[in-house]
């Protein structure tokens, strides 16, 4: 008898096809490490149902969550940044613009619309952090200024939702000028007796914090949002001191009088409607 003769049939090794999980179907929460269905997270406005961690959210999805359905219209959507300084670091500014545009989202770091909240007409500007870190250049400053000026002209409240790394370094002094430009426009809104509501989300830093983001008649933040000028690591290295726990987080700023209220994203629309009902009376 041959040593290699098989007297019994071998194990059936029929290959079972492995099922492929679609990319992006699951999301791991950085707050509690829970694995969440992406569609469930989106349905809850990117707020973790387990721990309440506020994931970042796109500008248009945020607008859908805040404004009355089918009432808002985007304005100044064709404006795009130009590399007028021929700025180049590891790659040119124009390459960075083209890369951001290729993602197919916003044409710059802010989306400005006219819409309504519970029937109250408002001018709203929402930052898109996915576009060059929500940095403020000349286009962002101009779009925000125009939104504020429309508010003055039409006697409507202005709401700005910030999510930004600050002024756009590729535009040098012209980006810093937007801080004064937007703040001056808000002074006109104040003189007209119209409310400005500032919503600070994670992160709101740099020149955006140092200008319009902290000038609201009501300053609202999302839970645990990072809000500050320089980053905590830069401050620690400069001062050579350990910063307090929770420094630059929304809760710390509220405790020290820098904010009026912290509102979860899922409750933001109702809170805005309530505030507008108190601060604003439409012209008859």
Curated annotation (Swiss-Prot):
EC main group: transferase
Ranges for domain CoA carboxyltransferase N-terminal: 25-284
EC number(s) recorded for this UniProt protein: 2.1.3.15
Family membership: Belongs to the AccD/PCCB family.
Positions with a binding annotation for Zn(2+): 29, 32, 48, 51
Description of how the protein assembles with itself and partners: Acetyl-CoA carboxylase is a heterohexamer composed of biotin carboxyl carrier protein (AccB), biotin carboxylase (AccC) and two subunits each of ACCase subunit alpha (AccA) and ACCase subunit beta (AccD).
Cofactor note: Binds 1 zinc ion per subunit.
GO cellular component, as recorded: acetate CoA-transferase complex
GO molecular function: acetyl-CoA carboxylase activity; ATP binding; carboxyl- or carbamoyltransferase activity; zinc ion binding
Functional pathway: Lipid metabolism; malonyl-CoA biosynthesis; malonyl-CoA from acetyl-CoA: step 1/1
Function: Component of the acetyl coenzyme A carboxylase (ACC) complex. Biotin carboxylase (BC) catalyzes the carboxylation of biotin on its carrier protein (BCCP) and then the CO(2) group is transferred by the transcarboxylase to acetyl-CoA to form malonyl-CoA.
Entry keyword annotation includes Zinc: yes
Pfam families: Carboxyl_trans, Zn_ribbon_ACC
Localization: Cytoplasm
Protein name from the UniProt record: Acetyl-coenzyme A carboxylase carboxyl transferase subunit beta
Species annotation: Pelobacter propionicus (strain DSM 2379 / NBRC 103807 / OttBd1)
